[in-house]
């Protein structure tokens, strides 16, 4: 059974009902004298101090945003987490965003700016914002820019961007001339004409690359974040944990991905120092240059620098890194693709490994723009295609979790209770 609530039953009111109520008498006052007597007695002997009321646990999880700033703001407001000025109003709520703030949509920069602001504001009210890395965050860190649009680049442009673009092209021409012997080793040539280069590196491109560098405003911010988090009985991440990786502790997964980012940054800096690449090279351009360098080294009559060769080979193996593997936590789609029978057993093993009851993931857009609980409500798939201009039928949504027991899908026009606690048992609301 799915429990529906009207649009007027706002999430703000629902959340406030969950907070500790103020004490109020359900009886009429017997009279002024009785009231004053009770006050005086209270002043004379207050008794032992009362323990503070337990704060009702409330978590809101949001799936992939993909630069859809307007709908992201809308669902945050619908969930009662921000006001019209985009300031935090969620009080003690924990907001979890499971990655893919970026790419495809028109305003990824505004989305990140809002998350950065809320991360600072929420703790002042007793709340918390947890921003997790998705595969698209990793892609931007490493320079895999296949889903970055010209509009996205333009958001980083300023009055000097055209000049920077021209200077970058001139640097590229010089690099291409000095590395002609390497480029000859490539099976496919890197772009040769000015028009091709400019089309692939539009105005704002150079600034975007700097912003995502280790020193850049967004690059530094993203590098501070984790890939997976456990809050209460729930595990949150972008893609999922493959059963073959369930032997890794959650902290190990996070540290492993951070180490891979550091390894990438270090390798890129080495390549820059050796003048193998230029600072604004994309991942594909870096890979091509490294492959050409490695091929030339092997053909050279000069004895190979074994350490250098190992670094080059190691870099080209990034596809096997935990952060890039198809069965890794940022890319895995098994929770969506498994049959119910296959997944039920697999999920049990994963949850047991982490002493958790449920996993919440994004990454794979759900049909009809609806969240989907699976495997006996032990997995919640919450990517509902917020960027509807890219995902037809998609919509903004938020998964609201009360006390690790009640799970509600919040949409802009309605609420759907997916799991409703009913005494000692839990009543399921969404059929598989």
Locate predicted features.
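N-terminal secretory signal peptides that target proteins for export/translocation
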Residues: 1-27
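Short intrinsically disordered, low-complexity coil segments enriched in acidic
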Residues: 2-3, 31, 125
């Amino acid at each position: 059974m799915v429990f529906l609530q009207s649009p007027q039953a706002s999430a703000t009111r629902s959340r406030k009902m969950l907070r500790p109520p103020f004490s109020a008498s359900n009886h009429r006052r017997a009279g002024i004298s009785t009231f004053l007597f009770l006050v005086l007695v209270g002043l004379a002997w207050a008794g032992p101090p009362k323990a503070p009321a337990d704060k009702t646990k409330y978590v809101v999880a949001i799936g992939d945003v993909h630069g859809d700033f307007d709908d992201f703001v809308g669902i945050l407001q619908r969930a009662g987490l921000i006001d019209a000025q985009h300031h935090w109003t969620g009080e003690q709520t924990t907001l979890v965003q499971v990655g893919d703030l970026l790419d495809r949509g028109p305003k990824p920069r505004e989305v990140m700016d809002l998350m950065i602001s809320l991360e600072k504001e929420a703790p002042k009210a007793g709340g918390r914002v947890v921003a997790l890395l998705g595969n698209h965050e990793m892609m931007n860190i490493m320079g895999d820019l296949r889903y970055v649009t010209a509009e996205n680049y333009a958001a980083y442009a300023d009055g000097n961007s055209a000049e920077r673009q021209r200077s970058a092209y001139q640097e590229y021409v010089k690099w291409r001339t000095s590395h002609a012997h390497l480029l000859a080793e490539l099976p496919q040539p890197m772009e040769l004409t000015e028009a091709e280069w400019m089309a692939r590196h539009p105005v704002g491109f150079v600034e975007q690359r700097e912003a995502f560098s280790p020193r850049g405003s967004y690059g530094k911010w993203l590098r501070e974040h984790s890939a997976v988090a456990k809050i209460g009985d729930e595990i949150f991440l972008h893609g999922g944990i493959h059963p073959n990786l369930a032997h890794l502790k959650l902290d190990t997964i996070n540290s492993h991905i951070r180490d891979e980012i550091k390894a990438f940054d270090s390798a890129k800096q080495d390549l820059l120092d050796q003048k193998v690449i230029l600072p604004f090279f994309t991942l594909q351009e870096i890979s091509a240059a490294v492959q050409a360098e490695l091929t030339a080294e092997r053909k050279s009559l000069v004895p190979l620098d074994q350490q250098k060769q190992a670094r080059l080979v190691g870099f080209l193996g990034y596809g096997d890194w935990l952060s890039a593997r198809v069965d890794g936590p940022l890319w895995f789609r098994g929770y969506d693709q498994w049959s119910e029978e296959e997944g039920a057993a697999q999920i049990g093993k994963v949850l047991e490994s982490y002493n958790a009851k449920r996993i919440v993931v994004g990454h794979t857009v759900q049909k009809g723009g609806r969240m989907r609980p699976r495997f006996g409500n032990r997995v919640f798939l919450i990517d509902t295609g917020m960027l509807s201009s890219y995902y037809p039928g998609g919509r903004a949504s938020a998964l609201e979790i009360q006390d690790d027991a009640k799970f509600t899908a919040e949409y802009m026009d309605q609420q759907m209770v997916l799991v409703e606690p009913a005494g000692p048992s839990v009543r399921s609301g969404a059929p598989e």
